[in-house]
Regions:
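Glycine- and acidic-residue-biased ligand/ion/polar-headgroup-sensing regions
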Residues: 40-59
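Short beta-strand His + acidic residue motifs that chelate non-heme Fe in jelly-roll/DSBH
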Residues: 34-36, 54-55, 80-87
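Ligand-binding loop in jelly-roll beta-barrel domains
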Residues: 77-101
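Basic/polar N-terminal segments that are highly enriched at the extreme N-terminus
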Residues: 1-10, 100-101
């Protein structure tokens, strides 16, 4: 990660937090981009709404994929990226950070 990038939060708002987990919500309208952000903890993403999302890592390239509401995925800490709603409908997810990771 380079220091020349201003980093934002991994989501729009914190829904819950205790000493073990922090739960975020992220909402992106079609074409909207999240701020560049860095994942400092392992986390689980649960898709709530949406049909397609693109992730643009700081390092280079992008990964685009269809998403299905209700689907969840575990991801390791360390990524620095921008999320883009590349779909036709609103994208919303819940991210659960594992604070002891």
């Amino acid at each position: 990660m380079t220091e020349s990038h201003d980093l934002g939060p991994i989501g729009d708002r914190v829904l819950f937090e205790d000493e073990q987990i922090r739960v975020w919500e992220m909402v992106l309208e079609p074409g909207e981009r999240s701020p560049m952000h860095h994942h400092t903890h392992d986390y689980i993403v649960v898709v709530v709404e949406g049909d397609h999302v693109t992730v643009e890592p700081l390092e280079a390239g992008s990964k685009s994929a269809p998403v299905v509401p209700g689907h969840s995925v575990f991801l390791r800490k360390g990524g620095t990226e921008v999320a883009v709603n590349s779909g036709a409908v609103r994208y919303r997810d819940v991210q659960i950070e594992l604070l002891d990771s």
